[in-house]
Amino acid sequence: MNKLENPLQNDVAGPAPRHRTTQVMVGDIAVGGGAPIVVQSMTNTDTADIDGTIKQVAALARAGSEMVRITVDREEAAAAVPHIRDGLRKLGLTTPLIGDFHYIGHKLLAEYPACAEALDKYRINPGNVGFKAKRDTQFADIVEIAIKNNKAVRIGANWGSLDQELLTKLMDENAASAQPRDVRAVTREAMVQSALLSAARAEEIGLPKTKMVLSAKVSAVQDLIAVYQDLASRSDYAIHLGLTEAGMGSKGIVASSAALGILLQQGIGDTIRISLTPEPGGDRTLEVQVAQELLQTMGFRTFVPLVAACPGCGRTTSTTFQELARSIQDFIRVEMPSWKTRYPGVENLNVAVMGCIVNGPGESKHANIGISLPGTGESPAAPVFVDGEKFRTLRGENIAGDFKALVIDYIEQRYGAAPKPGAAQMVPAAE
């Protein structure tokens, strides 16, 4: 049997080195060039609804989105953009705003200069920026406005709106070839060429690489991986990752995580968006949470303390550990906005909530603080471990409440400037 080769040729588990890209500043956020991978999201409000859009951008930003894209599809939306920016500033939010333009972006940016100034980045789709003779002119118009306003641009190809003239040309060339390629391979090549040719044209007009981000989105996982591998191998532009039309619920989460996870592991990607179709009335911020969890799970960034919990089995017929894990997870999410300033570094905390004696003590020892709750037929006692050492054993009807109090004490003492007066010290209790 052949031994699987480790491409890193050492004992360190981790991703491949990051693909070297040119850094782009979007507002005050650095994208590419070795900067931390950026989480972004997009609103689904009518941008002309100023109050509604401010509310959703604020929710996305507070959930952790570091950039937010908004649709600018008509005059009313373009006119609303400066007011949205100003409303966010009044809330103390400086999250960069990205304008998503299709078909008439050149017209809106020219006729609404306040919109062009208020946005931090313009997204151009080379497949619908213009058609025939108008395409190059309208593309140039947007690029020149970006240069004038010192704004970044994302050139985002999408196979749902691919440049048909370019695709037809490549398909005809392929049909005439002695060894024709698969149609999907030709489509992928058209995606990559669309992005790269547009970027080259933007540079000719005067937009530097330090102002450009590229993307090439498809909705099929394997095609997406192939497209981005090709794009990265042929350029050093900053890269935006995303699986378009990923879908709803678990399907969308799994598809996006599978595709982006593979690319990130290969060192590809400078900013990501998880494009989820929300349930009717669902929480738009879920896409931000999933993006953060993907990056944190893979070890690229830390956003919130991690809560490890066992999946449960026949040994854990009690729901106590499940309820406690959920309670701790929800508690952390609610408290993180204030914890970020009060307890620097708290995002690195690891908590374990385990359901029985099999893996409970061992997993708890690997966490900063962990608890092993009793499984079916086990003694009604729950040992707590702090930094790998047994700390105390909780008993009685309020194990969940007692453990949460210990978590709070641990955070205050490890990450606070000084323990709160009267706060319980992390001193092992006599058993």
From Swiss-Prot:
Disulfide links within the chain: none
EC class (word): oxidoreductase
Known catalytic reactions: (2E)-4-hydroxy-3-methylbut-2-enyl diphosphate + oxidized [flavodoxin] + H2O + 2 H(+) = 2-C-methyl-D-erythritol 2,4-cyclic diphosphate + reduced [flavodoxin]
Molecular function GO labels: 4 iron, 4 sulfur cluster binding; 4-hydroxy-3-methylbut-2-en-1-yl diphosphate synthase activity (ferredoxin); 4-hydroxy-3-methylbut-2-enyl-diphosphate synthase activity (flavodoxin); iron ion binding
Enzyme Commission numbers on file: 1.17.7.3
Pathway assigned in UniProt: Isoprenoid biosynthesis; isopentenyl diphosphate biosynthesis via DXP pathway; isopentenyl diphosphate from 1-deoxy-D-xylulose 5-phosphate: step 5/6
The keyword 4Fe-4S appears for this protein: yes
Pfam families: GcpE
Annotated GO biological process: isopentenyl diphosphate biosynthetic process, methylerythritol 4-phosphate pathway; terpenoid biosynthetic process
Cofactors (names): [4Fe-4S] cluster
Binding note for cofactor: Binds 1 [4Fe-4S] cluster.
InterPro entries the record matches: Dihydropteroate_synth-like_sf, IspG_bac, IspG_bac-typ, NO2/SO3_Rdtase_4Fe4S_sf
Binding, [4Fe-4S] cluster: C310, C313, C356, E363
Coiled-coil residue windows: none
Annotated keywords: 4Fe-4S, Iron, Iron-sulfur, Isoprene biosynthesis, Metal-binding, Oxidoreductase
Signal sequence annotation: none
Summary of the function given for this chain in its UniProt record: Converts 2C-methyl-D-erythritol 2,4-cyclodiphosphate (ME-2,4cPP) into 1-hydroxy-2-methyl-2-(E)-butenyl 4-diphosphate.
Family designation: Belongs to the IspG family.
Listed HAMAP family: IspG (MF_00159)
Protein name per its UniProtKB record: 4-hydroxy-3-methylbut-2-en-1-yl diphosphate synthase (flavodoxin)
Organism lineage string: Bacteria, Pseudomonadati, Pseudomonadota, Alphaproteobacteria, Hyphomicrobiales
Gene: ispG
